[in-house]
Amino acid sequence: VQKARELKLPIAFRVVVDGRDQGANTPQFVYDAGAEYAMSEPKYPDRKTPMPQDPIFQRYYEKFVAALAEEFNDPEYTSFIDGYGLGKWGEGHSVAYNKDDVSAVDENTETVKREVLDWITKLYAKHFTKVPLVINYHRVLGHPTSQGTANPNSESLVALAISNGYCIRSDAFGMNNSSWGYSTWEKAIAAQWRYKVPIIMEGGYIVSSHSYWNDPAGYRQGHPEDVRQGEFDSSAEARVNMMDFRVGQETESWFNDAFRL
């Protein structure tokens, strides 16, 4: 953050609370105060997953977002905020609501996930009034699963976020796997909302570390420019308003491997 400010560059970010994939992301004092959590791998005690519907967690999270806005609710410093951040990697899938089983789905799941999404999007919208807020349009948005066919309520959850003041983004551009990539459902959502709200793209592959050549699109190994072309084509189809080049190496790849785009 400090380096970006030295360079006079605005930043974009999401706040991740789930510890399954990265280690501790929610402070221990929140759990010490009584917030419920799941621990899917007991051998890694720091990898806790807070229950987003828990009132204690929500109380601390509300204080955090309010404090965050005091510093970052400024377009000079902030390009946009991905204001959901639940689930693995904060991508909005694999969201756990059962402390005993992070994958559990029951008769209350659809109600709880809608209530949580409504709460968190209204929270960010209350405090971030000067910078864009976005949500990942994921086929299993807010659900305990991570892939497969689209949940029938995902479309309405995207619409709910938009009604609360959000734009939309996807971090799977260029990925063509029908179970977890940027496929038919995602394209339909973009088509539904383009020209109505801004759309932001992020490429799904980090070409320096992901096996992008296994993608159904037939990207050639050793040819990251193939991935860049795939991302570009999907972005053009979606009519994106901004291309988020992700980590530093990805920015270098765009300029070195696909400058003509």
Over which residues does each language-model region extend?
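Generic structural signal for well-ordered alpha-helices
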Residues: Q2, V65-A69, L117-A125, W185-I189, ...
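Substrate-binding cleft of secreted/luminal carbohydrate-active enzymes
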Residues: P152-L261
